Amino acid sequence: MSNGNDVRPFRLDTPDEALADLRRRVEATRWPSRELVDDRSQGVQLATVQELARYWTSGYDWRACEAKLNALPQFTTSIDGVDIHFIHVRSKHEDALPLIMTHGWPGSVVELLGSVGPLTDPTAHGGAAEDAFHLVLPSLPGYGFSAEPTELGWNSNRIAQAWAQLMDRLGYPRYVAQGGDVGASVTDAMGRQAPEGLVGIHLTLLAGAIGIKDKLPANTEQERAAHGALETFMKDGFGYFLEQSTRPQTIGYSLLDSPVGLAAWMLDHDTDSYYKISRAFVDGEPVGRLTRDSVVDNITLYWLTGTGASSARWYWEAGRFLAAAAASGQAPPPVSVPVGFTAFPGEIWAAPRSWAETVYPGLAYFNEVEKGGHFAAWEEPELFATEVRAAFRPLRQS
């Protein structure tokens, strides 16, 4: 007899009918006219999406992604009434440090797959055995193969509590956490909750910058450039955020009915990653691991799981949580564990060290790297893994 704490093996087996339906829908797309500008200022460009659709129906193989996922140990377990899907790869090095790593939107566990080898088996990737991790990659509630919450309240704080339960259930009394995008918000919440066993966090996005932008330093050229990037995002890159934080259900109808509509919505996230992805499709010149196959893998996962609307609801929850916090006038509790932060140059706003120290006075590790963007682990998995190793190295037990 099963119980609520069971950890159950998971294997993906997509019905042929689902793939045939996807293909029919893509081929039946009703296309808009071309944008009237030569950049993305009106949105995702027609040439990019049409080339993506052509590849999706003529050159892409979902079964290859399915096999890649099924080659990894996957599981589900029920936490707080929601079935959570996760990948759990234990290193061959028994003294490895347990690490829970959280993806964001419009990402999934797909964006983290390239870092699995470097993090769990560093000796095969130019690293040392003492830098190994036991890796846990959960799918956020309402994302991918995790179930949709059926009640309100699944904001970053609640997800952080669920992740602490997951690590306890897996038998890890001491672990670290990492995240970017939505995952950065969840990991930040874990650091502020400081559950027993969590000894450090590492982030690639300074998610808290939006709420305190007027308090962030603007003295140096780098700081002023970061302010400029943040202002540009708030004025010209905020469309998806505003829609999903106010009307996720409304956009959800389109996201679950049109694969091409879903693809365009997911591509229209940030300028740096959009142009890199566009280059992969239009010019056939991918940047890092942002290849045509990996991009379509991620979009197809959203489509097959029907999670366009449910994933968007995290933003609605976040908006209400932040509004309530602002109305209360109470500052969030401090992060009481060591914090590591890596600034990737293509991030929506590449936070200077002074900004990271403002948000995290206990900053223990900071580095600026020369390449990579918002999807750091996806685009540059080896570099990303190097940063994660460096950030957590002082926290390992000898």
Residue ranges and their predicted role:
Residues 119-145:
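Conserved alpha/beta-hydrolase
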Residues 62-64, 110, 127, 140-154, ...:
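Glycine-rich "HGGG/HGxG" loop immediately N-terminal to the catalytic nucleophile
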Residues 244-398:
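C-terminal subdomain of alpha/beta-hydrolase-fold enzymes, centered on the catalytic histidine
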Residues 105-117:
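The serine-hydrolase catalytic nucleophile loop
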Residues 157-175:
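Conserved acidic catalytic loop of the alpha/beta-hydrolase fold
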Residues 96-104:
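Short beta-strand element of the alpha/beta-hydrolase
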